[in-house]
């Protein structure tokens, strides 16, 4: 089984045109085994097949890696650690804060951090809005995957976005409705808040996944 997973991961990485060292690939597969081991206890993923996790969890997250800019990354609603853990594994020169309000999931994330020896990862158990109320840490980028609507994410992340942090949101089908809602939010609040514009939308082609994937970059215009 392990050999098959290694082949699946290696092939997917080649198709994504990424270069990932063998030791990092081993950590990625170790991470999947940890998800499988603790899934029932911590309710980490609706996907139970480790073979399906290779494209749906690992490759889906790794497809975002070329778009990670800056050195201080905040992954909100991190859940089982997606995309934060895979991105931290393949970007050891960047620092990642994995944020989730579910205590069980952050306990799992801490176990992953220790097991994979990820010195560039910090795990925080907090709601997003409460985190920004308490902490003054500056981030270059906020990431999220299947977390909430674009407008909701912007509202709860408005404090860092207003001072230059950018948001990179992983979505499925092209989010026409969510973009329209964000434009309505901007129009209604432009007199009192910053305007949060969609800077770029990239369609991602993820090996082993037939459904649509889009990456939405949002930043403040003032």
Which residues does each predicted region cover?
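Class I SAM-dependent transferase core
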Residues: 2-70, 74, 104-107, 111-121
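S-adenosylmethionine
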Residues: 94-97, 101-222
């Amino acid at each position: 089984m392990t050999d098959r997973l290694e082949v699946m991961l290696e092939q997917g990485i080649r198709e994504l045109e990424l270069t990932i060292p063998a030791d990092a690939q081993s950590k990625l597969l170790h991470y999947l085994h940890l998800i499988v081991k603790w899934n029932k206890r911590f309710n980490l993923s609706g996907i139970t097949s480790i073979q399906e996790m290779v494209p749906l969890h690992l490759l889906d997250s790794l497809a975002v890696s070329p778009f990670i800019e800056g050195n201080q990354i905040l992954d909100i609603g991190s859940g089982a650690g997606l995309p934060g853990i895979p991105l931290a594994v393949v970007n050891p020169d960047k620092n990642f804060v994995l944020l989730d309000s579910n205590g069980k999931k952050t306990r799992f994330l801490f176990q992953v951090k220790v097991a994979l020896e990820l010195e560039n990862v910090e795990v925080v158990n907090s709601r997003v809005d409460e985190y920004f109320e308490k902490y003054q840490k500056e981030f270059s980028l906020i990431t999220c995957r299947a977390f909430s609507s674009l407008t909701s994410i912007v509202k709860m992340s408005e404090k860092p976005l207003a001072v230059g942090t950018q948001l990179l949101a992983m979505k499925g089908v092209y989010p026409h409705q969510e973009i329209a809602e964000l434009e309505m939010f901007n129009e209604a609040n432009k007199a009192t808040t910053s305007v949060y514009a969609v800077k770029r939308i990239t369609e991602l082609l993820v090996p082993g996944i037939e459904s649509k994937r889009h990456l939405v970059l949002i930043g403040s215009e003032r």
